[in-house]
């Protein structure tokens, strides 16, 4: 119920800041899906582009960024692009992937986004979803990681203690984006939210 209300409020906020020729990047996740589900059909804005902020993770296609991008674009009568790659690959593979023209073009557009919509997760839960091993998860805990957003793991002071390789949005990129919409709620995520938001 809390997440549903947050989704409605976030959709309402997005509706208020939309304008012509605007680029929206969004991550996957249950919270971001709530925004997309609650977004009304809007046709008055022209030249809106919707993009995934990163690749897709997990087995649940319904909450992957590419799926949510297509759904949001449909509601906004907008154009969209997809990023067809697994989110969690190593740096050498990322370098290779970024040389592919079609991916390079999408990534350049992602970095020029006007609005970034993202969820915030608990560090250990997100590490498991991203396929990190128990040893790596233990290392994250030792480093004080409490929250995760766009593949970055944050401690209580909002410092990035670890980040997964990506062709999409990274922590420093997020800071350059004009409007950030973080969607998260519930007591269990309080520490994660404070950690991530201290960075911004």
Model-derived features: positions:
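N-terminal active-site beta-alpha-beta segment that forms phosphate/nucleotide-binding
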Residues: 1-90, 200
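Conserved phosphate- and dinucleotide-binding cores of soluble alpha/beta proteins
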Residues: 56-200
């Amino acid at each position: 119920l809390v997440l549903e209300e947050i989704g409605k409020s976030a959709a309402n906020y997005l509706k208020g800041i939309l304008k012509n020729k605007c680029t929206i990047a969004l991550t996957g996740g249950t919270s971001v899906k709530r925004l997309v589900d609650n977004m009304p059909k809007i046709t008055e804005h022209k030249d809106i582009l919707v993009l995934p902020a990163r690749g897709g993770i997990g087995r649940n296609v319904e909450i992957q960024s590419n799926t949510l991008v297509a759904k949001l674009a449909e509601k906004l009568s907008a154009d969209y692009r997809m990023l067809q790659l697994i989110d969690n690959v190593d740096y050498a593979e990322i370098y290779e992937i970024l040389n592919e023209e079609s991916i390079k073009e999408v990534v350049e557009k992602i970095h020029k986004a006007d609005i970034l919509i993202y969820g915030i997760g608990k560090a250990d839960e997100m590490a498991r979803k991203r396929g990190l091993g128990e040893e790596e998860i233990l290392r994250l805990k030792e480093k004080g990681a409490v929250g995760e957003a766009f593949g970055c793991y944050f401690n209580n002071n909002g410092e990035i203690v670890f980040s997964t390789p990506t062709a999409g949005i990274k922590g420093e990129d997020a800071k350059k984006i004009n409007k950030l919409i973080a969607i998260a709620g519930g007591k269990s995520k309080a520490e994660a939210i404070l950690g991530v938001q201290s960075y911004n």
